[in-house]
Regions:
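Central cavity-lining transmembrane alpha-helices of secondary-active solute carriers
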Residues: 1-12, 205-220
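C-terminal ends and interior cores of transmembrane alpha-helices
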Residues: 29-43, 239-254
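Hydrophobic core of transmembrane alpha-helices in multi-pass small-molecule transporters
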Residues: 31-34, 44-64, 170-171, 258-274
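Multi-pass alpha-helical transporter architecture, strongest
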Residues: 38-41, 121-133, 305, 334-366
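Cytoplasmic helix-loop-helix junction between adjacent transmembrane helices
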Residues: 52-90
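A membrane-interface helix-boundary motif in multi-pass transporters
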Residues: 104-120, 317-343
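Juxtamembrane intracellular "pre-TM" segments in multi-pass secondary transporters
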Residues: 132-167, 189-194
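Short amphipathic helix-loop junctions that connect adjacent transmembrane helices
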Residues: 181-203
Length: 366
């Protein structure tokens, strides 16, 4: 719900009235307060309200972070495609560090993880105010009804290429939600039958391979985007999603099938980064300067908002069909269906998204 409403809404606020870095700082502070409250409340309804407030504050910071980062890179006279990924990789490293601290300290079983997250959010909020100013764009001369209502970013859908890209971002967002919702339950299902298996004993390490993979593939984005362009990079992402789900379908907790689980974690980095990070770079190039934050908000809404909702419901139907008494009885069939879905939308994307890329080769001659 938060991803569906807030990124686009906050994007409008940033484009029209408030500096993006200041808005991001305030949102992180709101998130910190809500997380502190969630850590100590004893009433479950109050806990849900606190977490909802946190998500409403946090989700738009993802799209705002793109806007602020691209603004800083542009001001420094750098290249977004070349210089943004080495910055973005630190977000994934932070995710890995937090996950390991959470697991090693035992915070995952108490309110320690919420307190740690609140402290990090408060520090991040303070840091945001030290970032280069990212002011609202100058108002357009002819402000029509769409502009007055804050719907300028919908102009993105008038362009065929951008509209197709956003449509398939929505469809890929559904695939992302599948792995977010059912990746961990799938691995946990091995506990009942193979409690001593490597994949069960070291499930945290196994899962963290996905984030390690992310750090590597993020750094590869400049090469692939400059050499092959967004269309081929997105097609590679679709192929990686097919492999991600396909490896899950044939993977197992012990013996040789463990290799496929490891490969699934590794290929996830390519599947996620080549879609999410590369997609934000493409949108930043396609969107006019006057709607830079709103455009990233629309991208976030399509992927983490609409895509997550549809992906959650759709995957839930598949899982329910292959379950008995709430227990999934045929995980391989589920993952095969998800792999087929990724394959089909990948083919459709290749056929409908028209983009001619001019490879950048200057840097290679230095």
């Amino acid at each position: 719900i938060a991803s569906l409403i807030m990124p686009a809404l906050i994007g409008v606020v940033s484009d029209k009235w408030v500096n993006a870095e200041r808005l991001m700082g305030v949102l992180h502070w709101v998130g910190a307060i809500s997380l502190f409250c969630a850590a100590f409340v004893t009433d479950y309804d109050l806990f849900k309200i606190a977490m909802l407030v946190n998500m409403l504050a946090y989700m738009p910071t993802l799209s705002l972070s793109y806007t602020v980062a691209y603004n800083a890179i542009d001001k420094a006279g750098l290249d977004r495609i070349k210089d943004y990924p080495p910055v973005r990789v630190w977000g994934t490293i932070g995710f890995i560090v937090a996950m390991w601290i959470d697991n090693l300290t035992g915070f995952s079983s108490n309110n320690g993880q919420l307190i740690m997250a609140a402290c990090a959010s408060a520090a991040m909020g303070l840091y945001c105010f030290t970032l280069p100013a990212c002011p609202p764009a100058k108002a357009m001369k002819n402000n029509g009804l769409m502009s007055v209502l804050g719907l300028d970013a919908l102009v993105l859908f008038k362009n065929y290429r951008t509209a197709v890209f956003l449509l398939f971002s929505f469809l890929l967002g559904a695939a992302l939600q599948v792995t977010n919702m059912y990746g961990v339950p799938f691995l946990d299902s091995f506990k009942a039958t193979h409690p001593e298996a490597w994949a069960v004993k070291y499930s945290v390490i196994l899962s963290s391979l996905s984030q390690v993979s992310e750090t590597l593939f993020i750094l590869a984005i400049p090469f692939f985007m400059s050499r092959y362009g967004i269309k081929r990079v997105m097609i590679i992402s679709f192929m990686a999603w097919v492999l991600r789900f396909g490896f899950f379908a044939i993977g197992g907790p012990e013996g040789f099938p463990v290799v496929f689980l490891v490969l699934s974690m590794i290929v996830y980095g390519m599947a996620f980064d080549f879609f999410n990070v590369s997609g934000s770079l493409f949108i930043s190039d396609e969107a006019p300067a006057s709607i830079k934050a709103s455009a990233q908000g629309i991208f976030m809404m399509m992927t983490n908002g609409l895509g997550s909702i549809v992906g959650g419901y759709g995957a839930g139907l598949v899982i329910a069909y292959h379950s008995e008494n709430g227990v999934v009885t045929d995980w391989p069939a589920c993952w095969t269906i998800f792999a087929a879905y990724a394959c089909v939308i990948g083919i459709l994307f290749a056929l409908t998204f028209h983009y001619k890329h001019q490879a950048k080769v200057k840097a290679e001659k230095v």
